[in-house]
Regions:
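Short, active-site-adjacent cap segments at secondary-structure transitions
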Residues: 13-15, 62-66, 110, 136-139, ...
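Structured, non-catalytic alpha/beta "coupling" segments that mediate domain-domain communication
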Residues: 46-57, 127-143, 149-150, 234-250, ...
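Long, highly charged low-complexity segments
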Residues: 257-337
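Domain-level signal for Mg2+-assisted phosphodiester chemistry and nucleotide/NA-binding surfaces
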Residues: 1-101
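Extended two-metal-dependent nuclease catalytic cores across DNA- and RNA-processing enzymes
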Residues: 2, 25-26, 75-251
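Short acidic, glycine/serine/threonine-rich loops at helix termini
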Residues: 17-20, 66-71, 140-145, 151, ...
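A residue-level signal for conserved active-site and pocket-lining positions in enzyme catalytic cores
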Residues: 9, 56, 114, 134, ...
């Protein structure tokens, strides 16, 4: 049976977890909902996928080659909320205690790290599962590379799994052709312009028939509707640039070793201490400790020592008595008579 590597898109999953769960803080006021949601997703998939290797890729603050090509790239994004921003280094600290490698690299995005390592892992004989909330990664799907897209809600996490054939079934195009679709329709979240007036349905129809933006342009007189034809002709260079921006690199030079991603003991002593500090009680079960509820003991009746003779007199008259042990969580807390 082939080894399997699971690659996680760090910022994407944190962001999805942050907006999918209500705000949580520990006693010190640290926000923890994104960290908890991230761990819930990761640990669920570790149980389901049973990977032998695991790593997480994060974006960096520096501009990437995409920003150099197009200054407005991601220019419309709102700043990260402070409550989420403070959880990024916290999440990295948690992963470090679990001995899960983190990869970041200046000049490229986490997507490019995932694309490069995913391709190299597939070529090395691994089965690959890439976890991200970003549908752009569908372009990386193959027969052996599965894209897992979680949707986090208060009621739980729902997952969409995509291999190459699943992308074809959904859009009618191959994962590679999906990039051309993005080039035509653009991407508002990344501020990739695309071609005005061409949305997802029209883009899918054009690429399904012509397979690439370049080939569609060569058959420009055949493109329908007329508005799409005219706009593609006018904004062709913008479409090519948008395709380039949407293309995830799979040939980056990244310093890493698959041996470092081999899963060992995720639930280390350091991880347990940090989980306790963050009060992630629902995850204590992974350390063999159930979440403990507040222990309370209600006193139903009492008597003073002056009445003790009357109690024993009643026992003598009845000829028998029952002695009960009051226990909480396996511990004796008192007696009842």
């Amino acid at each position: 049976m082939a080894d399997k590597i699971m690659l996680l898109d760090g910022h994407s999953l944190l962001n999805r977890a942050f907006y999918g769960l209500p705000d949580l803080t520990n006693a010190e006021g640290k926000h923890t909902n994104a960290v908890l949601g991230f761990l819930n997703i990761m640990l669920r998939y570790v149980e389901e996928e049973k990977p032998t290797h695991l790593l997480v890729a994060f974006d960096r603050k520096e501009p990437t080659f995409r920003h150099i090509k197009y200054k407005e790239y991601k220019g419309t994004r709102k700043p990260m909320p402070a409550e989420l921003h403070e959880q990024v280094p916290l999440m990295k600290e948690v992963l470090k205690t679990m001995e899960i490698p983190i990869i970041t690299q200046a000049g490229i995005e986490a997507d490019d790290i995932l694309g490069t390592i995913g391709k190299e892992a597939e070529e090395a004989g691994f089965d690959v599962a890439i976890v991200s909330g970003d549908r752009d990664l569908l372009q990386l799907a193959t027969k052996k590379v599965k894209i897992k897209i979680p949707k986090t809600k208060a009621s739980g996490t729902v997952t969409e799994d995509y291999y190459e054939e699943d992308v074809r079934e959904l859009y009618g195009v191959s994962p590679t052709e999906f990039i051309d679709m993005k080039g035509l329709m653009g991407d508002t979240s990344d501020n990739i312009p695309g071609v005005p007036g061409i949305g997802e349905k029209t883009a899918a129809k054009i690429i399904k028939e012509y397979h690439s933006i370049e080939n569609a342009h060569e058959h420009i007189e055949e493109i329908k509707p007329a508005r799409a034809k005219n706009n593609l002709q006018e904004y062709y260079e913008q479409a090519i640039m948008s395709k380039d921006l949407a293309t995830i690199k799979k040939d980056c030079e990244i310093a890493y070793d698959f041996k470092d991603a081999k899963i060992g003991t995720l639930f280390t002593k350091d991880a347990y201490q940090l989980f306790k500090e963050l009060e992630l009680k629902s995850l204590f079960k992974y350390f063999g400790e159930e979440e403990k509820e507040e222990e309370t003991l209600e006193v139903v009746s009492t008597f003073d020592l002056g009445e003790i003779e009357n109690v024993f007199a009643s026992i003598k008259e009845e000829g028998q008595a029952a002695l009960g042990i009051i226990g909480v969580s396996g511990n004796c807390k008192g007696l009842s008579l």
